[in-house]
Design a protein with these regions (language model features):
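Major-groove DNA-recognition helix of helix-turn-helix-type DNA-binding domains
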Residues: 16-36
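Arg/Lys-rich, alpha-helical DNA-contact motif
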Residues: 2-8, 41-122
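Homeobox/homeodomain signature
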Residues: 2, 15-16, 32, 51
Length: 122
């Protein structure tokens, strides 16, 4: 299967798929023409791996973390804990921002300077 078909099948962009190859998250077979251009041939396994990687990325696993899990499933314990901690911190940060924003009158029009001043007071 060619890269365009994989994009359509997975919903991933060409760039995302190529990055997964560059980062050695997947290793599809390929042929190289005389100009050095690679023509990839993706297997069903490659597509499954891309879909799995996409799910992990949606939950903010980094490419380095995904590589570690690919190479050693035991690392998933620590990595999952790290992702949970990061997500909890993101939620806390968002709640703090919402609390500050809730204190500002949204019925009034503000300039950028006025809005920045109001936000910096909180």
């Amino acid at each position: 299967m060619k890269i365009k078909s994989v994009c359509e099948l997975t919903g991933l962009t060409d760039r995302t798929i190529r990055r997964s190859i560059e980062e050695k998250l997947i290793s599809p077979l390929y042929t190289e023409n005389y100009l050095g251009r690679k023509n990839y041939n993706f297997s069903d396994r490659d597509i499954k791996d891309l879909n799995d990687i996409a799910v992990l990325r949606k939950f903010d696993f980094t490419l380095d973390e995904i590589k570690l899990v690919i190479n050693d499933a035991e690392t998933s314990k620590e990595i999952l804990s790290n992702v949970k901690d990061r997500t909890a911190q993101t939620v806390l940060d968002s709640q703090n921002k919402l609390s500050v924003l809730s204190q500002i009158n949204n019925e009034k029009a503000y300039t950028v300077a006025e809005l920045a001043e109001e936000l910096s007071k909180a």
